[in-house]
Design a protein with these regions (language model features):
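Structured segments of extracytoplasmic/periplasmic soluble domains
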Residues: 21-28, 46, 50, 73-81, ...
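Short, charged, surface-exposed secondary-structure boundary motifs
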Residues: 43-47, 67-70
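Short beta-strand elements at the ligand-binding edges of bilobed clamshell
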Residues: 49-64
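Hydrophobic alpha-helical
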Residues: 1-46
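Short, conserved active-site loop motifs that form the nucleotide-linked donor/cofactor pocket
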Residues: 32, 55-57, 92
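A structural signal for short secondary-structure junctions
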Residues: 28-29, 53, 88
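Hinge/cleft segment of the Venus flytrap/periplasmic-binding protein
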Residues: 61-109
Length: 109
């Protein structure tokens, strides 16, 4: 049988659904690594639990930075006619139980 589980999704809610399912199946948290993307309240609540769960972390992104970059691209497009690239990628930072408060502060979330 499967001994180690990886749960990945594009948000914390989906990952937490998988984590809760492993808990119901009595799979130890040490055998589960759940990672989401966003860096929102669901992750913060999980990090504050007394016992570590299978929710390992999230890739935190700053919606403020997304908005600033999008607005700057739009203004440049309007002013100069320079169309933004079709694929604009952003960066994120791994937020885990041990650094979540520092990452929140760093990213302004």
């Amino acid at each position: 049988g499967i001994k180690k589980w990886v749960i990945f999704a594009l948000n914390e809610e989906s990952v937490l659904g998988g984590v809760r399912a492993t808990e119901q199946l009595h799979i130890p948290a040490a055998d589960v690594i759940g990672v989401g993307i966003n860096g929102a309240g669901e992750a913060f609540a999980e990090f504050q639990k007394k016992e570590q769960t299978g929710f390992f972390g999230t890739i935190a992104v700053s919606s403020t930075n997304h908005g600033k970059e999008s607005a700057a691209n739009l203004v440049e497009w309007i002013k100069t006619g320079k169309q933004p690239p079709a694929d604009t990628q952003t960066t994120g930072k791994l937020m885990v139980r041990g650094n979540w408060q520092e990452v929140r502060k760093e990213l302004g979330i």
